[in-house]
Swiss-Prot record:
Name of the featured protein: Lipoyl synthase
Keyword Acetylation: no
Entry's family note: Belongs to the radical SAM superfamily. Lipoyl synthase family.
One cellular component (GO) term of this entry: cytoplasm
Main location: cytoplasm
Keywords: 4Fe-4S, Cytoplasm, Iron, Iron-sulfur, Metal-binding, S-adenosyl-L-methionine, Transferase
Residue sites binding [4Fe-4S] cluster 2 per the record: 103, 107, 110
GO molecular function, a single term: lipoate synthase activity
Record flagged with keyword tRNA processing: no
Cofactor binding comment, as recorded: Binds 2 [4Fe-4S] clusters per subunit. One cluster is coordinated with 3 cysteines and an exchangeable S-adenosyl-L-methionine.
Organism annotation: Actinobacillus pleuropneumoniae serotype 5b (strain L20)
Classification via SMART domains: Elp3
Pfam families: Radical_SAM
Residues covered by the Radical SAM core domain: 89-306
């Protein structure tokens, strides 16, 4: 599979994507109608609380990467350039990204490649299950790229992956972090309920005012409806959602989204700082200080969330096993 990071096409209408090619950076954002991406922008300096020392390479990190490569699998940790990769891999956890590494959406905050994806690998659910067994994992997170090219948007592939993991690893807990299925939420839940997960996660990402810029192709109401319908179908399965801050939203808007999530039955919450993957992505408007994350967590508890992980480096699947146990993550 090749990667394209080239210069911006002269004319967008003349730009033809090739199937199976991963378009990143300038090649990806050149086809996004967002006006505030300036590759020559001055980057906001990172404050002291955002500076971390990455651990050295370890046998555990190499083992997880080898396990992924051996089965031709992908981790969102690597594909999305997560800042917690070394910590999580050293901890022996990884988030599997199914249905390939090419997304049909082109969200300008995300470092996952855009393009025309290849057909699904029907053996992938089994490969994921075998990798989970090889790694002796007790808790796994399964996420995916958006697959708007598929009739069911990938719901059946999620269900098959959960089924295969549970069949081979009956003691393993499975959390799925799903896309919005392009609004076909009732159809998706009907498929997913054949093999329900232990935790159902779908990220709202940010506030509705900024959706056109942050999540082109998504719809705030679709996402809330997906979370609501799944919770109605499975009232005893925790539902979870994540938000990024630092994109130009206000704290008041974040609190309103948190209340919307509670009103739709969501019981678990993650809030973390947005980090700009490259100059060809949305810029960081501000770095939210730790005390404001503490405020979000306090407000989440007041609203009735059963668990809220809020902190600069928190991501949706960051220490997901500890989140599911109700332990403090920040």
């Amino acid at each position: 599979m090749t990667t394209a990071t080239g210069t911006k096409p002269k004319k967008m209408e003349a730009f033809k994507m090739e199937r199976g090619v991963k378009y990143r950076d300038a090649a990806k954002t050149s086809v996004i109608q967002v006006r505030n991406i300036d590759p020559d922008q001055e980057l906001l300096p990172k404050p002291s609380w955002m500076k971390i020392k990455l651990p050295a390479a370890s046998a555990k990190i190499d083992s997880i990467k080898h396990g992924m490569r051996r089965h031709g699998l992908h981790s969102v940790c690597e594909e999305a350039s997560c800042p917690n990769l070394h910590e999580c891999f050293n901890h022996g956890t990884a988030t599997f990204m199914i249905m390939g590494a090419i997304c049909t959406r082109r969200c300008p905050f995300c470092d996952v490649a855009h393009g025309k994806p290849l057909p699904l690998d029907p053996e992938e659910p089994r490969k994921v299950a075998e990798t989970v067994q090889d790694m002796k994992l007790k808790y796994v997170v399964i996420t995916s790229v958006d697959r708007d090219d598929l009739a069911d948007r990938g719901a059946a592939h999620f269900a098959a992956t959960v089924r295969e993991i549970k069949a081979l690893n009956p003691e393993c807990k499975v959390e799925i972090l799903v896309p919005d299925f392009r609004g076909r939420v009732e159809q998706a839940v009907e498929i997913l309920k054949q093999n329900p997960p232990d935790v159902f996660n779908h990220n709202l990402e940010n506030v509705p005012r900024l959706y056109r810029e942050v999540r082109p192709g998504a719809d705030y109401k679709w996402s809330l409806e997906l979370l609501k319908i799944f919770k109605q179908e499975f009232p005893n399965i925790p539902t979870k959602s994540g938000l990024m801050v630092g994109l130009g939203e206000t704290n008041e808007e974040i609190l309103e989204v948190m209340q919307d999530l509670r009103d739709h039955g969501v019981t678990m919450l993650t809030i973390g700082q947005y980090l700009q993957p490259s100059r060809h992505h949305l810029k960081v408007e501000r770095y939210v200080p730790p005390e404001e994350f503490d405020m979000f967590r306090s407000e989440a508890e007041r609203m009735g969330f059963e668990h809220a992980a809020c902190g600069p480096f928190v991501r949706s699947s960051y220490h997901a096993d500890l989140q599911a146990k109700g332990e403090l993550v920040k």
